[in-house]
């Protein structure tokens, strides 16, 4: 085929579509399709036409047609102007930074109203006796029994309702607020049941802040700091999380070892209702400690009456220092005694 004739045709098309090419309204391949459609006898296929378009617009990258008046070389800047990325809806979940230089009592998995009164009171008394001024509630303070996706026992409605559970949780929060200088409430997967229940059964109301659990519990009113279930906290060099935030942490050894395999940094968690500790060093000489705390709920729930085989009552104190280091007392509670 006469190359000159092909070139003249391509240049004419480029001239006719110059503005659209510059604005990104048509691609070189799109222009090649138009050329091939009108001149199928001159070009073998669309790709042949596209090669000619690239050659005569100076985009082929081999120095061909350097003097072409229609040089339309692709650039990142041009692409950004012609085609903008869609706005992302992703929200950056920044870590919650806890103040160092203080001593914390860490409680998790109380599961009101299925709490163990003796174990819970013992944990609070022990924390105060050890000089803890801050209380960190590390998730699953309330059970949210009536908002679960699992089958519930309808007979229990005679004993307590959603309102009962909310009121008991508020009563507990008001109580601990008198015992400590500062209370933090990190939501766990059981608190998250509330939001999921609204989405599924009352989606028209779920966008109203009034129905957010942290507002129903009046946390801000009582100066209790709320931390969402999808955020983790950092206390110096110690990461604190409920335990549901990351999948695949099960370990046949213990929860602490399973979380170490995932986090690879010093971490404290609840969720598994089991006291365990895993210590390991790194090749750089750093020391890592991972701690899973026991629970403060019944050890014989209806859905798992032998849970006490693996579960145990327990909590932890963490003394944090200004340099980010920390000291942990991951204690068990047996018959009301903190060990």
Residue ranges and their predicted role:
Residues 201-239, 243, 250-253, 292-297:
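Active-site-proximal loop/helix segment associated with metal-binding centers of metalloenzymes
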Residues 29, 41-73:
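Major-groove recognition helix of helix-turn-helix-like DNA-binding domains
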Residues 1-17:
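Basic, short loop/linker segments at the boundary and entry of helix-turn-helix/winged-helix-like folds
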Residues 107, 112-220:
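Core catalytic region of metal-dependent phosphoesterases/phosphodiesterases
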Residues 79-117, 235-236:
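Mobile, glycine- and charge-enriched loop segments
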Residues 102-104, 134-136, 238-239, 266-268:
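Structural motif
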Residues 14-39:
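Short, charged amphipathic recognition helices of the HTH superfamily
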């Amino acid at each position: 085929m006469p190359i000159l004739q092909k070139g003249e045709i391509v240049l004419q098309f480029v001239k006719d579509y110059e503005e659209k090419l510059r604005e990104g309204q048509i691609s070189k391949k799109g222009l090649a399709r138009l050329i091939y459609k009108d001149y199928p006898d001159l070009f073998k296929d669309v790709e042949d036409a596209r090669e000619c378009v690239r050659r005569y617009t100076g985009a082929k990258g081999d120095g061909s047609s350097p003097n072409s008046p229609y040089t339309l070389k692709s650039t990142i800047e041009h692409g950004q102007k012609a085609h903008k990325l869609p706005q992302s809806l992703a929200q950056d979940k920044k870590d919650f930074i806890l103040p160092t230089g203080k001593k914390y009592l860490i409680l998790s998995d109380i599961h009101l109203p299925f709490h163990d009164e003796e174990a819970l009171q013992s944990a609070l008394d022990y924390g105060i006796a050890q000089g803890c001024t801050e209380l960190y509630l590390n998730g699953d303070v309330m059970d949210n029994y009536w908002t679960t996706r699992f089958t519930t026992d309808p007979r229990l409605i005679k004993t307590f309702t959603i309102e009962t559970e909310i009121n008991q949780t508020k009563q507990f929060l008001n109580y601990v607020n008198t015992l400590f200088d500062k209370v933090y409430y990190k939501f766990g997967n059981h608190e998250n049941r509330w939001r999921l229940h609204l989405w599924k059964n009352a989606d028209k109301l779920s966008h109203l802040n009034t129905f957010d659990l942290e507002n129903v519990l009046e946390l801000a009113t009582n100066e209790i700091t709320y931390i969402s279930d999808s955020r983790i906290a950092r206390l110096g060099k110690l990461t604190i999380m409920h335990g549901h935030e990351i999948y695949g942490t099960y370990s046949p050894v213990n929860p602490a070892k399973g979380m170490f395999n995932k986090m690879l940094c010093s971490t404290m968690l609840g969720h598994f209702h089991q006291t365990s500790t895993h210590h390991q060093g790194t090749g750089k000489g750093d020391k890592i400690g991972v701690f899973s705390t026991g629970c403060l709920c019944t050890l014989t729930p209806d859905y798992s009456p032998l849970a006490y085989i693996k579960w145990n009552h327990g909590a932890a104190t963490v003394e944090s220092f200004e340099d980010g280091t920390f000291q942990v007392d991951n204690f068990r509670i047996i018959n009301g005694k903190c060990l």
